[in-house]
Amino acid sequence: MSKGTSIKEALSKWEEKNSEKAAEAKEVKLYQMLPPIEKMDASLSTLTVCEKLSLSTNCIEKIANLNGLKNLKILSLGRNNIKNLNGLEAVGDSLEELWISYNSIEKLKGIHVLKKLKVLLMSNNQVKDWGEFNKLQELPVLMELVFVGNPLEEKHSAEGDWQDRVTKSLKALKKLDGTPIIKNDEEEED
């Protein structure tokens, strides 16, 4: 099997293509690298100015080496092989959006560090139970959630009580699976 592209190589390609230093860029796109990126290595820490980092459509298994990305607001990791959310601590104080659809995440342990997270795009993962889902209650400003395609959502959508159960659990939520949440006045008063 061929060796994957390193972050350092990907950043070099990006700089060549964009005629800009990655370390000075607010948005860095390292998606769909050929061969794919397999590891989030220490070279990421050079992206101190970066506000939006895209690493989607690669073969990354673990979230790592985000220390140094003090300004990161949007992290895109969709379509990888990520199994858990460990490794987000370094961006806990800045990250506002996490795009992590089409991975293999079953457990939401580690998400609680994202105190500024407003948007979580997490469709097509493997979350199966409410115990895991309810860890999202630890995100005080979460307003938009996409969770379609997880076993938990599929089961409860089929039973017809998905939106109801989610809005009872996540009271600040404004949008679920692309649909605005309309609350009636009685719910607003609790």
From Swiss-Prot:
Pfam families: LRR_4 (PF12799). It is found in: Cytoplasm, Cytoskeleton, Cilium axoneme. GO terms for cellular component: cell projection; cytoplasm; dynein complex; microtubule. Keywords: Cell projection, Cytoplasm, Cytoskeleton, Dynein, Leucine-rich repeat, Microtubule, Motor protein, Repeat. InterPro entries: Leu-rich_rpt (IPR001611), Leu-rich_rpt_4 (IPR025875), LRR_dom_sf (IPR032675). SMART domains: LRR_SD22. One of its GO terms (molecular function) is alpha-tubulin binding. The keyword Chaperone does not apply. Belongs to the dynein light chain LC1-type family. Outer (ODAs) and inner (IDAs) dynein arms contain the molecular motors that generate the force to move cilia by ATP-dependent reactions. There are two mechanosensory systems that monitor and respond to the mechanical state (curvature) of the axoneme. One system involves the central pair microtubule complex and radial spokes and the second system involves the outer dynein arms. Part of the multisubunit axonemal ATPase complexes that generate the force for cilia motility and govern beat frequency. Component of the outer arm dynein (ODA). May be involved in a mechanosensory feedback mechanism controlling ODA activity based on external conformational cues by tethering the outer arm dynein heavy chain (DNAH5) to the microtubule within the axoneme. Interacts with DNAH5, a outer arm dynein heavy chain. Interacts with tubulin located within the A-tubule of the outer doublets in a ATP-independent manner. This is Dynein axonemal light chain 1. It comes from Ciona intestinalis (Transparent sea squirt). The gene is DNAL1.
